Amino acid sequence: MTDRAEQDAALGRRLFVAIPIPSEVRDAVTALVDGVRGAGDPAVRDVRWVRLDGLHLTIRFLGPTDEDNVADVAAAVDRTAGRRPPFDVVIAGGGAFPSVARPRALWLGVAEGATDLAATATALGDALADVGWTRDDRPYRAHLTLARSDGVRSGPAVARRLIDAAAAVREPFRAESLVLFESISGGGPARYVPLHEARLA
């Protein structure tokens, strides 16, 4: 077990709530990333790419959570899903946070569905507040994280390559459920294990 994994285990289970990406969109994103990573520049390997089998749109990151609180979080997910209808999402374009010049995260954007995603995040925040969680007042920014590049010298170049490759990306899907995931670190990119799923009403 890595130091990070040991710390997380001591603090609780690292949880987040997200909308899963369907397999057909995941396949298209995987092809895009494979193209960027296979461009022949060894600098691309310096960027820490996420596991593509666990792609998701994060609604709320909860962080280390005590085992006694997991059931309350799952209930909040159920209440949120029961109040939100399914909606359409379009993944399109790429970018970097906080900027291409100094990227910490590389991502694909949301061309349609951002308002519904933000409303879902607000509804989940309300449901979590009812069971004792602090509200997250930061603006919700819908995106699909593909890589972490903080402190990597080649980050800006890889960000530009991803943005160029993503210019033609337009992948629609129907958001139909909310999933409570556990993030398990150690031995490479984190694995995302679904703990609870609730269908949107």
Each PLM stretch: what is its role?
Residues 1-201:
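Histidine-dependent nucleotide/RNA phosphoesterase domain, centered on the 2H-phosphoesterase fold
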